[in-house]
Amino acid sequence: MYDDYLTIALSKGTLLEPTLEVFKKLKLPGEGINDKSRSMVFTYDNERVKYIMCRPTDVPTYVEQGAADLGIVGKDVIVEQARDVFEMVDLQYGYCRFVVAVPEAIKNITLKDLNYKRAATKFPVIAENFFRSQGLQVEIIKLHGNIELAPLMGLADMIVDLVSTGRTLKENRLVELIKIMDSTTRLICNRVSYRTKHQQIQPLIENMQKLSTGGSA
């Protein structure tokens, strides 16, 4: 049965508040949504819009599988997962960067000195692709949190991680060696939904593009 609601997967956490600010400017509904709510689905019948609250790493899966028509998620997650979705708009917020960071004690090493070393990361695909592109053989150690601990405990020689202010690196006596890529928040779209709900989706895309380039929706 065809569902005429536009379903949007929202990333919980730091991206939620700026996303709701964008929706407010676009005159999209958002009453009652906050990161502390236990509700996972918010439905607005008058506007025919439905939001689902997801962990950021789950957003591309919901969109790819058609459980959501659209999703709001960081570029880092998109690149790491390589899901079969359309990337529609760079929303220009939630900026951070992927970096290779090493202990302060070896801050003067060069990129080629990383050959045959070990890198801890939550993003093994991005890390492996980067080192391979540089012609380096690096052992990737996947962790799920506290990446900065790995060099301190001798588990890894370096880390590959997302950085915004750099404060966490400094607190753990790590320094940025090289930037791999920038990451900002993106609007992604299910491939089938883009065709079947084009009349609902395309105006939203165009208005988001206007906002992201400094215009008004």
From Swiss-Prot:
PROSITE patterns from the UniProt entry: ATP_P_PHORIBOSYLTR
Superkingdom classification of source: Bacteria
Broad class of the protein's primary localization: cytoplasm
UniProt xrefs under InterPro entries: ATP_PRibTrfase_cat, ATP_PRibTrfase_CS, ATP_PRibTrfase_HisG, ATP_PRibTrfase_HisG_short
UniProt keywords, alphabetically: Amino-acid biosynthesis, ATP-binding, Cytoplasm, Glycosyltransferase, Histidine biosynthesis, Nucleotide-binding, Transferase
Broadest EC class assigned to this enzyme: transferase
Disulfide bonds: none
Reaction it catalyzes: 1-(5-phospho-beta-D-ribosyl)-ATP + diphosphate = 5-phospho-alpha-D-ribose 1-diphosphate + ATP
Pfam family, one: HisG
Localization in the cell: Cytoplasm
Any one biological process term the GO annotation gives: L-histidine biosynthetic process
Keyword flag Cytoplasm: yes
Listed pathway(s): Amino-acid biosynthesis; L-histidine biosynthesis; L-histidine from 5-phospho-alpha-D-ribose 1-diphosphate: step 1/9
Single GO MF descriptor: ATP phosphoribosyltransferase activity
Family, per entry: Belongs to the ATP phosphoribosyltransferase family. Short subfamily.
Function description: Catalyzes the condensation of ATP and 5-phosphoribose 1-diphosphate to form N'-(5'-phosphoribosyl)-ATP (PR-ATP). Has a crucial role in the pathway because the rate of histidine biosynthesis seems to be controlled primarily by regulation of HisG enzymatic activity.
Name this protein carries in UniProt: ATP phosphoribosyltransferase
Organism: Syntrophomonas wolfei subsp. wolfei (strain DSM 2245B / Goettingen)
Gene that this sequence comes from: hisG
